[in-house]
Amino acid sequence: MEQVAEGARVTAVPVSAADSTEELAEVEEGVGVVGEDNDAAARGAEAFGDSEEDGEDVFEVEKILDMKTEGGKVLYKVRWKGYTSDDDTWEPEIHLEDCKEVLLEFRKKIAENKAKAVRKDIQRLSLNNDIFEANSDSDQQSETKEDTSPKKKKKKLRQREEKSPDDLKKKKAKAGKLKDKSKPDLESSLESLVFDLRTKKRISEAKEELKESKKPKKDEVKETKELKKVKKGEIRDLKTKTREDPKENRKTKKEKFVESQVESESSVLNDSPFPEDDSEGLHSDSREEKQNTKSARERAGQDMGLEHGFEKPLDSAMSAEEDTDVRGRRKKKTPRKAEDTRENRKLENKNAFLEKKTVPKKQRNQDRSKSAAELEKLMPVSAQTPKGRRLSGEERGLWSTDSAEEDKETKRNESKEKYQKRHDSDKEEKGRKEPKGLKTLKEIRNAFDLFKLTPEEKNDVSENNRKREEIPLDFKTIDDHKTKENKQSLKERRNTRDETDTWAYIAAEGDQEVLDSVCQADENSDGRQQILSLGMDLQLEWMKLEDFQKHLDGKDENFAATDAIPSNVLRDAVKNGDYITVKVALNSNEEYNLDQEDSSGMTLVMLAAAGGQDDLLRLLITKGAKVNGRQKNGTTALIHAAEKNFLTTVAILLEAGAFVNVQQSNGETALMKACKRGNSDIVRLVIECGADCNILSKHQNSALHFAKQSNNVLVYDLLKNHLETLSRVAEETIKDYFEARLALLEPVFPIACHRLCEGPDFSTDFNYKPPQNIPEGSGILLFIFHANFLGKEVIARLCGPCSVQAVVLNDKFQLPVFLDSHFVYSFSPVAGPNKLFIRLTEAPSAKVKLLIGAYRVQLQ
């Protein structure tokens, strides 16, 4: 990168090519990178030698802008010296025989653009490529700055002819030297023309190559060298800007301020990479830095002067030309315009930073070396972050407000380039090539970074709120100064609406407001109470297990009510989902009848279940509200929840002991409601809790009928498979119990399921149609299996503890087959309707389910 920066500088300032070559050689001896410096200087000087040899010819070719093929002939778009872009013409190659150097330069530009994609995997980069890429960049940018008037061009032409003959000879000698060396390289790389990537890819690869090639013992040298490289990159950017100006007045501008910059750069180059040598050149280096800063600021200030209403020109001709350039670029509105503005902005920011910094240079270099070493440890894969990126937070602090207007004009073009052309680039490359001046989009990106926290970092919301303006550890490893940058970006975020695209502002603000609102207190509709930090929307990622359990138990917060809350207010609060009011009321000393019904028979639990208010439901259940209350039409809270399709509400009610087989006045159960809605999750949940799939509604329809009616195959298959499982388990249990001495012929009625916890009484009605031919020696037995459901698995038994006390069929007691066990009863149904009643033991907390089935059996 030393070579890249120096090459670009020689390109921009050919008059000092020889001196800079010697300075480059001195630095390279210090860091172990030697060679090709004279060749690089000669190659960089070539770009100017050819176009300035014939200054007296008015019709001299300034440069070639483009090429095309028409009718088998290759035509070149020519910019004539002293003329504007409106006078560009397409000329055949034969007309350009006297301008072979210009043609050669254009071909090199084409070749280098093409070679970028090919060289992606090549570790070693040749120096001349970077030199000519710098030329091609500045050439393209200078296309937008050619609209100066012909009168000024003639003035500059006269000044140019006064140029010293020694400098001219120097250029011609170097140009001739380069001609012989560069032709073979050109011809080998002209085969395919691909205009893809920009200079930053090669810069990044050169960084990696430098990092890999150097020995570990030269780490300190490398770190200081990175700092020097950034300084030289700044001067190179300034001189690339110089090259963008029309070539007639280049001499005048260069002679005014380039010499001071060359002296400053030579001071930087001769600065030893070791800390102990830094103090020697402290005073001279600071003096030359100020001189360099002053010159650069004058140029950048002129470029922005038109918009901000102040002008500080070096001289009248220079100021007028800068104004013309600004107007011309604004008319064209190309991506190049945005790049010019960004470069000027970057330059001004950097110089402002250098001017305002008062720390001694030795201390600064030590700090930078320290930060570079830390970055190298933490980022082994990527190259070290450029200094400009590391200090971007402080640069933003020094950002002047008068650049906001121009920032608005360029932000759209800039954002398009970033998101289309640079989507896959590294963060370091982005930090180098992105505009340092356009702070707004970087701040938006930093604001987005704050929300990409890992769950561990979001574990405690109070800590998160306390440190919201700090950056996570992951981001500190990327950028030493990024914490300051993010703090500042959060403070200034409110001012970015006028400076950024609407979508970007809304995205960043919206995400931040979501974070802010986690623990932010709002006032409810009454304006008296505040919303809990653990409010209705549970933020489970930061909630601890103890907090969550307290929340489930209703013990998370305690409020002292100032005034007693009336019952009607409590009912309205439950209906509206006002968690705070309900909690305050239930935690007060006031006594409420939680099972009180309204005119339709709705209790508070039913209201909460029908509204899907899970938190309120848990709170009411914790305070002792009953979950099995029934309206006048037989509807329960579980039926309400299933009908409204609230899965979690159904789960809470089932866990609290809600009865699943309760029927409405029309005979429908919660299972039937779930089948109607086609919610397979609720169906599975109530089935596994012991719902009876064979209960018939008032119109003699079962749950299977409603599943088929809802046209939901999943629900239908779920029910069918469950019924088949129950039948299979019952038959296998009978065979095992009777040791295969009993043959099952046919079922008398479908298997019914009753949960013992739902009550000590079971009753059902069924129709019995006896077969025409009753097999000899056969009879009917009633089996009452005690079963447990383990998910889809069902385990049944006909022995052990028994909860059956009596069986009554059509008002007649049925006798047990075995006196010591009441699992199997003799059974004598009549043809037609029959009514079965079974008296069971009272066991409200029992988990056992009773499977009740009757079969015609025959002894074998």
Curated annotation (Swiss-Prot):
<feature type="modified residue" description="Phosphoserine; by CDK1">
    <location>
        <position position="164"/>
    </location>
</feature>
<keyword id="KW-0805">Transcription regulation</keyword>
<feature type="modified residue" description="Phosphoserine">
    <location>
        <position position="85"/>
    </location>
</feature>
<feature type="compositionally biased region" description="Polar residues">
    <location>
        <begin position="129"/>
        <end position="141"/>
    </location>
</feature>
<dbReference type="InterPro" id="IPR002110">
    <property type="entry name" value="Ankyrin_rpt"/>
</dbReference>
<feature type="modified residue" description="Phosphoserine">
    <location>
        <position position="189"/>
    </location>
</feature>
<feature type="region of interest" description="Disordered">
    <location>
        <begin position="206"/>
        <end position="440"/>
    </location>
</feature>
<feature type="modified residue" description="Phosphothreonine">
    <location>
        <position position="454"/>
    </location>
</feature>
<dbReference type="Pfam" id="PF00385">
    <property type="entry name" value="Chromo"/>
</dbReference>
<feature type="compositionally biased region" description="Basic and acidic residues">
    <location>
        <begin position="280"/>
        <end position="314"/>
    </location>
</feature>
<feature type="modified residue" description="Phosphoserine">
    <location>
        <position position="403"/>
    </location>
</feature>
<dbReference type="GO" id="GO:0005737">
    <property type="term" value="C:cytoplasm"/>
</dbReference>
<feature type="compositionally biased region" description="Basic and acidic residues">
    <location>
        <begin position="408"/>
        <end position="440"/>
    </location>
</feature>
<dbReference type="GO" id="GO:0045814">
    <property type="term" value="P:negative regulation of gene expression, epigenetic"/>
</dbReference>
<dbReference type="InterPro" id="IPR050889">
    <property type="entry name" value="Dendritic_Spine_Reg/Scaffold"/>
</dbReference>
<dbReference type="GO" id="GO:0005829">
    <property type="term" value="C:cytosol"/>
</dbReference>
<feature type="compositionally biased region" description="Basic and acidic residues">
    <location>
        <begin position="336"/>
        <end position="377"/>
    </location>
</feature>
<dbReference type="InterPro" id="IPR023780">
    <property type="entry name" value="Chromo_domain"/>
</dbReference>
<feature type="modified residue" description="Phosphothreonine">
    <location>
        <position position="144"/>
    </location>
</feature>
<keyword id="KW-0677">Repeat</keyword>
<feature type="repeat" description="ANK 1">
    <location>
        <begin position="600"/>
        <end position="629"/>
    </location>
</feature>
<dbReference type="GO" id="GO:0035064">
    <property type="term" value="F:methylated histone binding"/>
</dbReference>
<dbReference type="GO" id="GO:0044027">
    <property type="term" value="P:negative regulation of gene expression via chromosomal CpG island methylation"/>
</dbReference>
<feature type="modified residue" description="Phosphoserine">
    <location>
        <position position="136"/>
    </location>
</feature>
<feature type="repeat" description="ANK 2">
    <location>
        <begin position="633"/>
        <end position="662"/>
    </location>
</feature>
<feature type="modified residue" description="Phosphoserine">
    <location>
        <position position="392"/>
    </location>
</feature>
<keyword id="KW-0539">Nucleus</keyword>
<feature type="modified residue" description="Phosphoserine">
    <location>
        <position position="266"/>
    </location>
</feature>
<dbReference type="GO" id="GO:0005654">
    <property type="term" value="C:nucleoplasm"/>
</dbReference>
<keyword id="KW-0804">Transcription</keyword>
<dbReference type="InterPro" id="IPR023779">
    <property type="entry name" value="Chromodomain_CS"/>
</dbReference>
<feature type="modified residue" description="Phosphoserine">
    <location>
        <position position="192"/>
    </location>
</feature>
<dbReference type="GO" id="GO:0141005">
    <property type="term" value="P:transposable element silencing by heterochromatin formation"/>
</dbReference>
<feature type="region of interest" description="Histone H3K9me3 binding">
    <location>
        <begin position="80"/>
        <end position="87"/>
    </location>
</feature>
<feature type="region of interest" description="Disordered">
    <location>
        <begin position="129"/>
        <end position="191"/>
    </location>
</feature>
<dbReference type="GO" id="GO:0005730">
    <property type="term" value="C:nucleolus"/>
</dbReference>
<feature type="repeat" description="ANK 3">
    <location>
        <begin position="666"/>
        <end position="695"/>
    </location>
</feature>
<comment type="subunit">
    <text>Homodimer. Interacts (via chromo domain) with histone H3K9me3. Has the highest affinity for H3K9me3, and lesser affinity for H3K9me2 and H3K9me1. Component of the HUSH complex; at least composed of TASOR, PPHLN1 and MPHOSPH8. Interacts with DNMT3, EHMT1 and SETDB1. Interacts with MORC2; the interaction associateS MORC2 with the HUSH complex which recruits MORC2 to heterochromatic loci. Interacts with ZNF638; leading to recruitment of the HUSH complex to unintegrated retroviral DNA. Interacts with TASOR. Interacts with humanin.</text>
</comment>
<protein>
    <recommendedName>
        <fullName>M-phase phosphoprotein 8</fullName>
    </recommendedName>
</protein>
<dbReference type="GO" id="GO:0062072">
    <property type="term" value="F:histone H3K9me2/3 reader activity"/>
</dbReference>
<feature type="site" description="Interaction with histone H3K9me3">
    <location>
        <position position="59"/>
    </location>
</feature>
<keyword id="KW-0040">ANK repeat</keyword>
